[in-house]
């Protein structure tokens, strides 16, 4: 499970949910897997890995995407207990596993994140961005909720009865494209604007994003009532 549900609409898990889930899974003999593909590598700001937000330790962690900063690479990290299960003669084989170019790039990505304090940037600049988005939420009734952590944020668009406004979400993303800003939607109803910029995003970038969001939210089409 993802520590913050991404394609489900940037949904933050209730406090204690993951701890309780892990307990039930382990009592049933299962293993706990944390999908860190989207939320990992400091993007959430408060922690390097998403599972750390919930005070749990998974048995398996899956990582990818930002690991190579555009270059294809993924990895699975597991506990020693699970790794030892492969010591019985069973062998895992992957034709492209351990590719030296991919591994070299991933190593540099990890170093770059650390050298440039990008987790701290996600915390501080992402926090600033969320505060500015909440200001828009108070200004425009169409914004049902702003949620997320660091540079992993979502804006849910709803009417006064909390009905999802997918058409308005699509309108907004297409209008933003006209200003050179590429965004997309998530969630089962397609009404959540996802905001996941590169974690080198700075305050000036945030201000530009807010400027155009404010402009579009003020357009007649976005006034649903």
Task: Tell me the role of every PLM-derived stretch.
Residues 1-225:
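Conserved N-terminal phosphate-binding loop of PLP-dependent enzymes in the Aspartate aminotransferase
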């Amino acid at each position: 499970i993802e520590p913050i549900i991404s394609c489900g609409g940037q949904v933050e898990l209730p406090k204690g949910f993951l701890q309780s889930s892990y307990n039930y899974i382990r009592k049933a003999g299962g293993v706990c897997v944390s999908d860190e593909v989207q939320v990992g590598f400091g993007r959430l700001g408060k922690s390097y890995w998403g599972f750390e937000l919930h005070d749990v330790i998974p048995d398996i962690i899956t990582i990818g995407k930002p690991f190579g900063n555009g270059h294809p690479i993924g990895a699975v990290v597991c506990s020693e207990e699970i790794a030892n299960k492969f010591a019985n003669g069973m062998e895992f084989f992957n034709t492209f596993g351990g590719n030296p170019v991919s591994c070299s790039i991933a190593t540099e990505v990890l170093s770059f994140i650390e050298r440039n304090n990008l987790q701290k940037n996600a915390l501080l600049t992402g926090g600033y961005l969320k505060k500015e988005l909440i200001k828009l939420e108070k200004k425009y009734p169409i914004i049902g909720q702003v949620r997320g952590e660091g540079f992993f944020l979502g804006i849910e668009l709803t009417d006064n009865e909390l009905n999802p406004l997918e058409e308005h979400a699509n309108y907004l993303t297409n209008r933003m494209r006209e200003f050179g800003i590429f965004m997309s939607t998530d969630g089962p109803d397609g009404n959540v604007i996802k905001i996941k910029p590169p974690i080198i995003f700075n305050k000036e970038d945030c201000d530009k994003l807010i400027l155009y969001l404010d402009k579009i939210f003020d357009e007649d089409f976005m006034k649903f009532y």
